[in-house]
């Protein structure tokens, strides 16, 4: 029960041919959206159809269709050529057997046999190989031969001079001192700008701090110079921070215009600054020590001079440093 008769080879070939034709014919039917109008196939569908038909024609010309497989698409079904089977007569069969028997009798017997070879010994010890002798394989290689001893003169490591260490410490102290004075001067400039800002918004007769009468034991003082402990101290440094941010914003805007160079003003400004830097760099000394001495001298003059002189020296320092950068 439930058993089916076995299919013959011809039936299986016909079924396989039908499956192959179904797969090839499925590629020729357009699938999905054809075009925006839905009437004509797209170029991809046409090319796929042409490629499929070429494959079908190639298989048909080669006679690869099994028997009965061409009925699905109406193609011609050439029958494959059968291989002719050799027909032997009893006399020819007897002659072949006699010839093979004589060949076996006249064949020379095997006299020598090759004994099975033992696996090679990859690890050779000194004395096992006559070519090596008492030396190992690494010792005979020219890359591993020991070179004659060369006398090496060892020099003691150079001790650091005391002057170099002292110079580094002195340079660090000078850097800290200059940074401290620069911070003080920046705060002083910010306080002057804060004072100018307050003078524009307050009358001259009312420049006293409004927080000195809040009950704290603080001596009378002006706005912008509040000591530690006065409630106006935090407001003063808040104004200084806002002024500093405004200066950074203006500087960033100028740098943006200078880097882009999209406006005529930026191009003219860059051309004038380049000409100024080139003229200043031509006047600067080429010795690095002289340049460092010049910059240090200008810094000392700036830190110990009045406001007008400080402004001029600051501009000179900026021009000098910019010229150094432009020259390098």
UniProtKB/Swiss-Prot annotation:
The modification Phosphoserine is found at residue 118. The chain crosses the membrane at residues 164-184, 237-257, 283-303. Residues 2-161 are annotated as: Pre-S. The keyword Lipoprotein applies. It holds the Pfam family vMSA. One of its GO terms (cellular component) is viral envelope. Residues 63-128 are annotated as: Disordered. Keywords: Fusion of virus membrane with host membrane, Glycoprotein, Host-virus interaction, Lipoprotein, Membrane, Myristate, Phosphoprotein, Transmembrane, Transmembrane helix, Viral attachment to host cell, Viral envelope protein, Viral penetration into host cytoplasm, Virion, Virus entry into host cell. It is found in: Virion membrane. Residues 76-88 have a biased composition (Polar residues). InterPro entries: HBV_HBSAG (IPR000349). Residues 2-163, 258-282 are extracellular. The large envelope protein exists in two topological conformations, one which is termed 'external' or Le-HBsAg and the other 'internal' or Li-HBsAg. In its external conformation the protein attaches the virus to cell receptors and thereby initiating infection. This interaction determines the species specificity and liver tropism. The large envelope protein probably also assumes fusion between virion and host membranes. In its internal conformation the protein plays a role in virion morphogenesis and mediates the contact with the nucleocapsid like a matrix protein. Belongs to the avihepadnavirus major surface antigen family. The large envelope protein is synthesized with the pre-S region at the cytosolic side of the endoplasmic reticulum and, hence will be within the virion after budding. Therefore the pre-S region is not N-glycosylated. Later a post-translational translocation of N-terminal pre-S and TM1 domains occur in about 50% of proteins at the virion surface. These molecules change their topology by an unknown mechanism, resulting in exposure of pre-S region at virion surface. This is Large envelope protein. It comes from Duck hepatitis B virus (strain United States/DHBV-16) (DHBV). The gene is S.
């Amino acid at each position: 029960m439930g058993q089916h008769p076995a299919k013959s080879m011809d039936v299986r070939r016909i079924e396989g041919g039908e499956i192959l034709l179904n797969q090839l014919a499925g590629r020729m039917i357009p699938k999905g959206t054809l075009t925006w109008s839905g009437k004509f196939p797209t170029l991809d569908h046409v090319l796929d159809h042409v490629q499929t038909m070429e494959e079908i024609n190639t298989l048909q010309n080669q006679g690869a269709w099994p028997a009965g497989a061409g009925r699905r698409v109406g193609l011609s079904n050439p029958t494959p050529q059968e291989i002719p089977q050799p027909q032997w007569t009893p006399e020819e069969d007897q002659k072949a057997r006699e010839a093979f028997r004589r060949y076996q009798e006249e064949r020379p017997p095997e006299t020598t046999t090759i004994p099975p070879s033992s696996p090679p010994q990859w690890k050779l010890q000194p004395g096992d190989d006559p070519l090596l002798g008492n030396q190992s394989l690494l010792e005979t290689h020219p890359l591993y031969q020991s070179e004659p001893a060369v006398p090496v003169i060892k020099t003691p490591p150079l001790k650091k001079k005391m002057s170099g260490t002292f110079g580094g410490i002195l340079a660090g102290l000078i850097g800290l001192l200059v940074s401290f004075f620069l911070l003080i001067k920046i705060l002083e400039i910010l306080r002057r700008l804060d004072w100018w800002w307050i003078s524009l918004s307050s009358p001259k007769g009312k420049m006293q701090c409004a927080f000195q009468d809040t009950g704290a034991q603080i001596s009378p003082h002006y706005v912008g110079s509040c000591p530690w402990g006065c409630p106006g101290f935090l407001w003063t440094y808040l104004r200084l921070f806002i002024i500093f941010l405004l200066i950074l914003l203006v500087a960033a805007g100028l740098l943006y215009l200078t880097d882009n160079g999209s406006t005529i003003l930026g191009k003219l400004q860059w051309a004038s600054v380049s000409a100024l830097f080139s003229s200043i760099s031509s006047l600067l000394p080429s010795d690095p020590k002289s340049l460092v001495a010049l910059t240090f001298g200008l810094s000392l003059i700036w830190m110990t001079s009045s406001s007008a002189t400080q402004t001029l020296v600051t501009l000179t320092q900026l021009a000098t440093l910019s010229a150094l950068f432009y020259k390098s």
